[in-house]
Amino acid sequence: MMMGNTFGSSLASLFFLWATIQQIFPNHLRIAIKEFLISTIQQLSFVQRFSDRFINFFSPYVEISFSQYEDYQFNHAFAAIETYLGAKATDKAKHLRASQVKESKGLVLKRDETKVRDEYEGGTVWWEMETDSTGYRTFKLTFHRRSRDIVTDSYIKYVFEEGKSIQAKSKQMKLFTNNPSSHWGTSKKSFWRYIDFEHPASFHTLAMDTKKKEEILNDLAAFSNGKEYYKKIGKAWKRGYLLHGPPGTGKSTMIAAMANHLNYSIYDLELTAIRNNSELRKLLTATSSKSIIVIEDIDCSLDLTGKRKKEKNLMTSREDGEQGTEEDKSFVTLSGLLNFIDGIWSACGQERIIIFTTNHFEKLDPALIRRGRMDMHIELSYCSFEAFKILAKNYLDLDTHPLFKKIESLLKETKIAPADVAENLMKKNTEIDADGSLKDLIQALEGKKKIHGAQVDEPKDKYTKKFYKAFCMSSKA
């Protein structure tokens, strides 16, 4: 009411002033004064507010703006919206824009149109992009006011999540390894170095029991889709896997297949290059979400008394061009590692998988591998006939062959790693056919059968056992 009185009295004063001007000033001065008064009225804040309210009263539409930059920082919401709108109905758009985005697998196609219409839960919204004089862009979302609750409560969140999901799928996966702390700078980026991860492994080509493979895939699916579930039960969104088995049974290939299946980058953590628990914490907090953190040969990397194996520490130091001094020794403890796996620091980041591998399951401390830390124990054993058939399909494109029965019989009688089977099936040159590769495998299996048949029970005395193992190794060589 007060604003209306102010507006009315001000308007009456202006009319009185204009009538006086018309009587006193000549025509050309009256025109100049009229233009001045009009511009002055337009600049009055209460007139602007009145006009805005007047327009909003009759307009049923609401508008939300998303700027490219907020407080001099890039607005990630803008990027998610741009990705969502760019990917939406690109097959129907008449104008497309192609670009090579950093960390993307290839060219990214986006709509090059400033206006996009979208449908959501029976309502219609309109997106429009505007560019100011400085080149900064802004997305404006327009919708009917009856859709306000749907748009603000769920539609905007849906756009953000879809945009981020599309970004993740097109992002180039990376393989990280930690730098020695002597190479660290002030930025967290200096903690890790990386290369593009382009391993071709997949669960389709993985040589293992089909039921076990399905069990792992179901577990990965439950984890990747379990954000709300983990939040509901009050646990950090992470999963632990222990891969154990003899050398050559596919532990590293399994990790690569998991990464490709989930589209996660891999952090290969070398514990021998870390001096203490504080450095370990800095490294792990610098990892990204949607990633796999791998510690291979955990039984060799971490001595369960809290001390590192000196030989491996010295070897790592020399590889990094450093001397194996006392200061270079690593003192990462078991408790320090466990604190990050399931302690208070485990909540740092989300949607992360932690994988330990070992060739010697029996050497591991039960505290390290108990359920809840390593949620799933996956044994990767010697090659079975079912695994062989997958390898035969991968390498020779064979579903069946007359020699398969003999190979099946030999696999039951001897132990051979899938990697050794694959080596025999791989064609060495163009002249070797499938028959030749299978015969090479049969010969290798028969050779192993003879060696295993000649072996006696392994002695239990530690001194005799030492010489026994040396004898077996020389026999295999």
From Swiss-Prot:
Q: Which UniProt keywords apply?
A: ATP-binding, Hydrolase, Magnesium, Nucleotide-binding, Signal
- Family of the protein in this entry: Belongs to the AAA ATPase family. BCS1 subfamily.
Q: What is its EC number?
A: 3.6.1.-
Q: What is this protein called?
A: AAA-ATPase At3g28600
Family matches, as InterPro entries? AAA+_ATPase, AAA_N_dom, ATPase_AAA_core, ATPase_AAA_CS, Mitochondrial_chaperone_BCS1, P-loop_NTPase
PANTHER family registered for this protein in UniProt: BCS1 AAA-TYPE ATPASE
| Tree of life domain | Eukaryota
The prosthetic group or cofactor this protein requires is: Mg(2+)
Name the catalysed reactions: ATP + H2O = ADP + phosphate + H(+)
Keyword Ion transport attributed: no
For this entry, list what GO says about its biological process. response to salt stress
Q: Where along this sequence does the record place binding of ATP?
A: 245-252
Species name for this entry?
Arabidopsis thaliana (Mouse-ear cress)
So which residues are the signal peptide here? 1-26
Q: Which SUPFAM superfamilies match?
A: P-loop containing nucleoside triphosphate hydrolases
Q: What induces it?
A: Induced in roots by salt stress.
Name any one GO molecular function: ATP hydrolysis activity
